[in-house]
Amino acid sequence: MRLTKVCLVAVTMLVATVVRADDIDALIGKLDQFNTVSGKAMQVITSADGEEIQKTESEFKILRPGYFYWRTLPPYEQIIVSNPDTISVYDPDLEQVSIYQSEKMRNSPASILSGNRSAIEKQFKVTKSGASNDKKSTSFELSYLDTANADFKKLTVTFKKDQLASIVMHDMLDQVTSITFGKVNTKAALTPAQFEFTPPAGVDVIIE
C-alpha cells in the first residue's frame, strides 16, 4: 500500500487541461470495459541502481467501483481488503490487522483500478502514450497533483489488447515497483460480500 505543475500562461494551461481531460476519458474508457476482474500478479521491487530488492506473487480481485482484494503469497504473505468504507491490512507474520478509512488511502494505486473518474481527476494528472514498439499496447502515466502528500513520483498503467497488463510505480527514493498481471479474468462473478474482512481470532487490531 505503498502508491504537476501549473502552466505559466493561459493558453498553455487551456491546452493542458483539454489534453488531460481527453487522456482521462481514454483511461476511464479502458477501465470501464470491466466491472469485475481477478487474476494473478508478479511484483518486483528494484533499487535506484537497478538491483532487485524483492519479488513476490499475488492474487487479486476487483469489483468496481470501490472494492479491492489483494493477497501477497508466502513467504511475504499479506492480505489487503478494501470496500467503500474501510481498508483492512492483515499481516499474518505479525498477527496484526490495521484498519484504515478508505478516504485516507484515496491516492493509492488501488484507487485507480477500483475507483471512479472523480477520484482520478482529483488525485492525478493523466497522460496517455502508446507503448513503445507495441502498437497493441496503450500506457497512461499518472502523476500526483498533490505532490506533498504523494507516495510515488509517478505510476504508469499499461493495457495490452484492452486487457490490464502492468503497473509501474516510481517512489520518492527512486525505487521502482513493477507489477505484471496474468490470468486476468474480466468475467469474474464477484459480489460486495466477498470484500468484507473479519480479523482472525487472537490477532491485534489497530484502527488508524
Swiss-Prot record:
Record family assignment: Belongs to the LolA family.
GO annotations of cellular component type: outer membrane-bounded periplasmic space
Alphabetical UniProt keywords: Chaperone, Periplasm, Protein transport, Signal, Transport
Pfam families associated with the record: LolA
Subunit details: Monomer.
Superkingdom of the organism of origin: Bacteria
Family matches, as InterPro entries: LolA/LolB/LppX, OM_lipoprot_carrier_LolA-like, OM_lipoprot_carrier_LolA_Pbac
Keyword Chaperone on entry: yes
Matching SUPFAM superfamilies: Prokaryotic lipoproteins and lipoprotein localization factors (SSF89392)
Localization of this protein: Periplasm
Keyword Transport: yes
Natural source organism: Saccharophagus degradans (strain 2-40 / ATCC 43961 / DSM 17024)
Signal peptide: 1-21
GO biological process, one term: lipoprotein transport
Protein's UniProt name: Outer-membrane lipoprotein carrier protein
Function statement: Participates in the translocation of lipoproteins from the inner membrane to the outer membrane. Only forms a complex with a lipoprotein if the residue after the N-terminal Cys is not an aspartate (The Asp acts as a targeting signal to indicate that the lipoprotein should stay in the inner membrane).
